[in-house]
């Protein structure tokens, strides 16, 4: 049997009746001879194997993806775009979050060349380096997260010839400073809670929902790099305090106690922070049950508010709001991580995770920039303020979580 006929049979387009027994069809005009392909045009898409049409991936499959949506392809494109075009000058916590995602992608894909370029870009910012003055100085949660990059470098190079102890020293100094009394000349007053009210919390605690990624990741990375339990214990204690303060009965989080709106990216920061925390927190840790409870409550809420397009909105509980890519990528990361670890029921949550990843990749343009990203946003007690936020392309607030979601799909963990 000819291969073409077999393919059509598999696809259900021909019956299995022998050709001799079929009723003869009227002769059809033969197509004209095709011209040679134009070398100036992109190659025509090669059809996928017939079995893909017959046996498509299940709704919850997290391994087989449409053309152009694989985590390897998306992750590589965004990591390369970051190091070649977006990392020229340090620009704060969105850059740190993207750097972390790119380093993790390089580690998981064994891309040593990419890893070394990411490290080389940070090296001038070490003490005494040509760009050391670009390191932030404020005692503020949005600045202290810079310590994540040297800590991640220490983690991914541990035991390798390229390991440099300076990265661990610099990273842990930021993590230690986050719990030390603030230096007045380097303090951003709005972010610092009076020390006598802290009850073991960081002086940088301000009870904005965003903090639960910024603060969480610095302490987690310090623990991952050193194994020192103090970083993990105080981090988990902090997260429980934020859960008690900001999570609502519906599972979502207010931007701040005095701003009662469920802002997409704000909730995304918390979702991603909880997923990262639960990846590391031991099963017997006294705060794990409370954090897992808060995480599951939020994931259940996200199922309710996910749009038919796979996305979440700028204000999560307002379907009339615009689909926002950075929050959707963060929720995708949190869902993927929960399904792969078994914290979430795969039958219920994996389809939502798959839809969200495919939807988010559709917002990556031909230049590898993520589109429809909410601009940097402080808190304000106004619904219209959030609905009217500027939508940006290539903003690192969006590049970073798409990298995290790609990394989550590539991780082999449960």
For each predicted feature, which ranges?
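Boundary at the C-terminal end of the N-terminal hydrophobic targeting segment
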Residues: 19-23, 29
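Positively charged n-region of N-terminal signal peptides that target proteins for export
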Residues: 1-4
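Bacterial N-terminal signal peptides
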Residues: 6-16
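Extended ligand-binding groove/face enriched in aromatic
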Residues: 115-116, 125-256, 367
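Extended ligand-binding clefts on enzyme/binding-domain cores
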Residues: 162, 166, 206-315, 321-332, ...
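Glutamine-centric residue-chemistry signal
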Residues: 22, 86, 182-183, 247, ...
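Aromatic-lined, polymer-binding surfaces characteristic
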Residues: 71, 91-102, 106, 139-154, ...
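CBM-like carbohydrate-recognition segments
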Residues: 36-96, 105-147, 153-170, 186-189, ...
């Amino acid at each position: 049997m000819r291969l073409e006929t077999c393919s059509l049979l598999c696809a259900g387009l021909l019956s299995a009746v022998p050709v001799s027994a079929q009723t003869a069809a009227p002769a059809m005009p033969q197509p004209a001879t095709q011209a040679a392909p134009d070398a100036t045009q992109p190659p025509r898409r090669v059809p996928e194997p017939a079995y893909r049409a017959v046996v498509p991936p299940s709704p919850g499959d997290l391994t087989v993806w449409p053309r152009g949506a694989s985590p390897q392809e998306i992750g590589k494109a965004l990591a390369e775009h970051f190091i070649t075009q977006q990392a020229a000058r340090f620009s704060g916590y969105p850059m740190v979050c993207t750097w972390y995602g790119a380093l993790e992608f390089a580690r998981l894909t064994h891309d040593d060349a990419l890893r070394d370029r990411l490290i080389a870009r940070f090296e001038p910012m070490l003490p005494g380096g040509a760009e050391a003055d670009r390191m932030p100085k404020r005692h503020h949660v949005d600045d202290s997260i810079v310590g994540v990059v040297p800590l991640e470098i220490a983690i991914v190079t541990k035991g390798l010839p390229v390991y440099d102890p300076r990265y661990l020293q610099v990273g842990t100094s930021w993590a230690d400073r986050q719990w030390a009394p603030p230096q007045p000349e380097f303090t951003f007053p709005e972010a610092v809670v009076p020390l006598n009210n802290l009850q073991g919390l960081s002086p940088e605690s301000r009870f904005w929902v965003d903090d639960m990624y910024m603060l969480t990741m610095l302490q987690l990375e310090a623990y991952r790099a050193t194994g020192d339990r103090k970083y993990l214990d105080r981090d988990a204690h902090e997260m429980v305090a934020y859960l008690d303060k900001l999570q609502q009965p519906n599972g979502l989080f207010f931007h701040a106690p005095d701003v009662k709106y469920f802002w997409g990216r704000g909730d995304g920061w918390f979702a991603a922070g909880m997923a990262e925390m639960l990846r590391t927190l031991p099963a017997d840790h006294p705060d794990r049950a409370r954090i897992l409870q808060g995480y599951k409550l939020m994931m259940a809420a996200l199922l309710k508010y996910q749009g038919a397009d796979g996305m979440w909105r700028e204000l999560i509980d307002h379907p009339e709001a615009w689909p926002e890519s950075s929050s959707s990528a963060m929720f995708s990361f949190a869902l993927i991580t929960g399904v792969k670890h078994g914290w979430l029921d795969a039958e219920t949550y994996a389809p939502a995770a798959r839809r969200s990843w495919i939807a988010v990749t559709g917002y990556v343009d031909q230049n590898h920039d993520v589109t429809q990203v909410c601009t940097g946003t402080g808190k304000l007690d106004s619904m219209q303020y959030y609905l009217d936020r500027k939508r940006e392309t290539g903003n690192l607030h969006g590049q970073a979580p798409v990298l995290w979601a790609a990394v989550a799909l590539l991780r082999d963990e449960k």
